[in-house]
From Swiss-Prot:
The gene coding this protein: msbA
Residue span, ABC transporter domain: 353-590
Localization (cell): Cell inner membrane
One GO cellular component, as annotated: plasma membrane
Keyword annotations: ATP-binding, Cell inner membrane, Cell membrane, Lipid transport, Membrane, Nucleotide-binding, Translocase, Transmembrane, Transmembrane helix, Transport
Entries under Gene3D superfamilies matching the protein: ABC transporter type 1, transmembrane domain, P-loop containing nucleotide triphosphate hydrolases
Pfam families: ABC_membrane, ABC_tran
UniProt xrefs under InterPro entries: AAA+_ATPase (IPR003593), ABC1_TM_dom (IPR011527), ABC1_TM_sf (IPR036640), ABC_transporter-like_ATP-bd (IPR003439), ABC_transporter-like_CS (IPR017871), ABC_transpr_lipidA (IPR011917), P-loop_NTPase (IPR027417), Type_1_exporter (IPR039421)
NCBIfam families for the chain: MsbA_lipidA
The protein's name in its UniProt record: ATP-dependent lipid A-core flippase
Length: 597
């Protein structure tokens, strides 16, 4: 299986991902919330301080609350202090939890909006490179990994780190010699965690790539369910899904093995230190260098420090998952936006279009020196209908895709009203173009909003557009008329109705330049006659480029350009091209022979 391009790439324009890089990229989102975050950290610090205060209360209780020299004040002060500490701890934990949730959910919202904004404004090349499942994973699911990191990991790193610091400080206060023995473990633990981190990060990145592949398999199976069923491909798809799922399971287990090593090894090292401390403490007690209360407080503090250390070890695996998610999130945010153009306004174009020595090559073909379009030149007068004909793969669709700047030519110029299109504001240019593709796209919205997509829906204009597209009778019979939902990609409509709704959208836009890519290919003969008449009325006074594989639909074009292998090989009217007896005449004969058969 060839590797598919994905959004998973080093963030920060090629910088290796690390906590410092992630923090630097997240800082613009954190900065406006810094005081809320500081409040959460203060609350966590208070909570961590209460952990260190508990063993500190044991020493006076054991030394002065028991035996013949017991102090009545110590007997009652310590229980009251425990209750007070518990209350402070509860309030501080609630405050830190709420404040952190506020910060993380605001950052989640900002990241998600930024990602969707960049996705919707990126170039067409991005959508050809990335699968839909990869983009959905990044915007919907991967950004939640950041939420998990910001919530659980941040809480653990801050609160448990502060707990360790407070407890270590108290241990040094009690007995600095014994504490140094504990401190010797920290470099060993740090080396161990660093070793595991590198392996976990690599495994997480590979796991994410496989997750995208699995999502893509599901996406293909759902989108192509008819093909799967009619070709009895259920077992094939099941085998593909099972194979990829097993690979994912293998990576998950490898991650579990690597991530799970840190905790038991850390606990083993801590147990060795505890055994040494107990031995030395017993020796010190025999020479009155420590008290029972001091020894119990020291051991209790040591035992209490194990739990936050364990949490700090456990945070490693979700932290690495979050780092991998950051690579994907900022990989999308760093995608270049479409060029906005030169900013020249264009209220309403006259409709003059010129292709001047235009060449184009897709990036994948550049190394093979294969031009999709090669030195294309022609002019279209305002209101003229130009038809593009030719065998499949000759470059017709690529040519019309250059006009709204879905791609920019690699050579030559395209002009509208005598001005090179890069000089126009991109949105102003596209507002002059209506397009009906053979791949109809409808949104899960009302009929009216689909017809008026990108504009405010005017009921009168919507109905007029539907009438012109021969769809009004169908819509009028629907329960809610133009307010009826059409379903996912128009699933509530037939193929011909979906095509006519797309045509109604182009009619509603009322742009001076029309691009019709096999616009009537999905219509029955009766509907095609009505729609063809509506399109002919619509095309009057408008520049029109028509792509049709059925030559009968473009016979009345002012001029027909015949393309082959990215070049214009013939040009003329229908009758002129038939008289030339070239490629167009050959294609015409083949189609009419098939129709007769």
């Amino acid at each position: 299986m060839s590797a598919k391009p994905t959004l998973s790439k080093p963030i920060g324009s090629g910088e290796a991902s690390s906590p410092a890089v992630v923090f630097r990229r997240l800082w613009p989102y954190i900065k406006p919330l810094i005081w809320v975050l500081i409040g959460a950290i203060v609350a966590m610090a208070v909570s961590a301080a209460t952990d260190a205060a508990i063993p500190a209360l044991l020493k006076p209780l054991l030394d002065k609350g028991f035996g013949a020299h017991a102090n009545d004040r110590a007997k009652w002060f310590v229980p009251a202090a425990v209750i007070g500490l518990a209350l402070i701890r509860s309030l501080s934990q609630y405050a830190s939890g709420y404040l952190l949730a506020y910060v993380t959910n605001k950052i989640l919202l900002d990241l998600r909006l930024k990602m969707f904004d960049r996705m919707i404004h990126t170039s067409v090349a991005f959508f050809q490179r990335e699968t839909a499942s990869t983009v959905i994973n990044a915007i919907v699911f991967e950004v939640n990994q950041i939420l998990n990191v910001l919530l659980s990991v941040l809480v653990t790193l801050v609160r448990d780190s502060l707990t360790v610091v407070f407890l270590l400080g108290y241990l040094f206060y009690l007995n600095w010699r014994l504490t140094l023995i504990v401190a010797v473990l920290l470099p060993a633990i740090g080396w161990l965690v660093g070793k595991i981190n590198r392996r976990l990060r690599r495994l997480n990145r590979e796991h994410q790539l496989l997750t995208n592949e699995l999502s893509y398999i599901v996406e293909e199976s759902v989108g192509g369910y008819k093909v799967v069923k009619v070709h009895n491909g259920e077992q094939y798809e099941m085998d593909r899904f099972e194979s990829m799922s097993k690979r994912l399971r293998g990576y998950a287990m490898r991650m579990t093995v690597s991530g799970g090593l840190a905790q038991p090894l850390t606990q083993f090292l801590a147990s060795i230190a505890l055994a040494v401390v107990i031995t030395i403490a017993v020796v010190q007690s025999s020479s009155d260098q420590t008290t029972v209360g001091g020894f119990v407080a020291f051991v209790t503090s040591m035992l209490l420090i194990i739990s936050p250390l364990k949490h700090l070890m456990d945070v490693n695996q979700p932290l690495q998952r979050g780092m991998t998610a950051c690579e994907m999130i900022f990989g999308l945010i760093d995608e270049p936006s479409e060029p906005e153009g030169g900013g020249k306004p264009l209220e309403r174009a006259h409709g003059a279009v010129e292709f001047r020595d235009v060449s184009f090559v897709y990036s994948g073909n550049a190394t093979h020196n294969r031009h999709t379009l090669d030195q294309i030149s022609f002019r279209v007068a305002p209101g003229e209908m130009i038809a593009l004909a030719g065998p499949s793969g000759s470059g017709k669709t690529t040519l019309v895709n250059l006009l709204p700047r879905f791609f920019d030519p690699t050579g030559g110029q395209i002009l509208v009203d005598g001005v090179a299109i890069p000089e126009y504001d991109l949105h102003a240019l596209r507002s002059q173009i209506a397009m009906v593709s053979q791949d109809v796209v409808l949104f899960n919205d009302t009929v009216a909003n689909n017809v008026a997509y990108g504009q405010t829906a005017d009921a009168g204009k919507v109905k007029a557009a539907l009438r012109a597209a021969n769809l009004w009778d169908t819509v009028e019979a629907m329960p809610k008329g133009i307010e009826t939902l059409v379903g996912d990609n128009g699933m509530m409509l037939s193929g011909g109705q979906r095509q006519r709704l797309a045509i109604a959208r182009a009619i509603y836009k009322d742009a001076p330049i029309l691009i019709l890519d096999e616009a009537t290919s999905a219509l029955d003969s009766e509907s095609e006659r009505h729609v063809q008449a509506a399109l002919e009325t619509l095309m009057k006074g408008r520049t029109t480029l028509v792509i049709a594989h059925r030559l009968s639909t473009i016979e009345r074009a002012d001029r027909i350009l015949v393309m082959e292998a990215g070049r214009i090989v013939e040009s003329g009217s229908h009758r002129e091209l038939l008289a030339q007896d070239g490629l167009y005449a050959h294609l015409h004969r083949i189609q009419f022979q098939q129709s007769a058969a």
